């Protein structure tokens, strides 16, 4: 079974759609094996988004992701990374298909409700960062 990290970002928590996201994950046949509501500290946020450190939007991304509580989950299932990314939709909600989480609820590329690991390597690194006991 493959595992992936899923975050319901602060915009999703603020808009009270945690249950909707979880329902979609479960209906897809994926299993939530760990879940926590937390406010991310700046150090963890910077480590999580380290691949963007040189990009002009890095500071605003860190500020956004630390700006309120989020839900962190480890999701498991057959091809979990690909399965969740198909549920999430394109990063830009304008380009995300209707019926995807971002297509239905996302506002812009930052306030796009969820994050999901994009590769096996990223999933392992991100799970270790958020849930070290599961790594």
Swiss-Prot record:
Cofactor entry: Mg(2+)
UniProtKB keywords: ATP-binding, Cytoplasm, Kinase, Magnesium, Metal-binding, Nucleotide metabolism, Nucleotide-binding, Phosphoprotein, Transferase
GO terms classed as biological process: CTP biosynthetic process; GTP biosynthetic process; UTP biosynthetic process
Keyword match Ubl conjugation: no
Localization per Swiss-Prot or TrEMBL: Cytoplasm
Membership in a protein family: Belongs to the NDK family.
Subunit record text: Homotetramer.
Function: Major role in the synthesis of nucleoside triphosphates other than ATP. The ATP gamma phosphate is transferred to the NDP beta phosphate via a ping-pong mechanism, using a phosphorylated active-site intermediate.
PANTHER family: NUCLEOSIDE DIPHOSPHATE KINASE
Protein name: Nucleoside diphosphate kinase
Organism (species): Thermobifida fusca (strain YX)
């Amino acid at each position: 079974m493959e595992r992936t990290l899923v975050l319901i970002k602060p915009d999703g928590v603020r808009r009270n759609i945690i249950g909707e996201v979880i329902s979609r994950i479960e209906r897809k046949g994926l299993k939530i094996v760990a879940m926590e509501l937390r406010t991310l500290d700046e150090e963890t946020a910077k480590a999580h988004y380290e691949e963007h450190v040189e990009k002009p939007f890095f500071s605003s991304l860190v500020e956004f992701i630390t700006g309120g509580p989020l839900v962190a989950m480890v999701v498991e299932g057959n091809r979990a990374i690909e399965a969740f990314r198909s549920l999430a939709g394109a990063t830009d909600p304008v380009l995300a298909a209707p019926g995807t989480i971002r297509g239905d609820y996302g506002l812009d590329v930052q306030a796009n409700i969820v994050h999901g690991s994009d590769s096996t390597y990223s999933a392992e690194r991100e799970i270790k960062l958020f849930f070290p006991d599961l790594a």
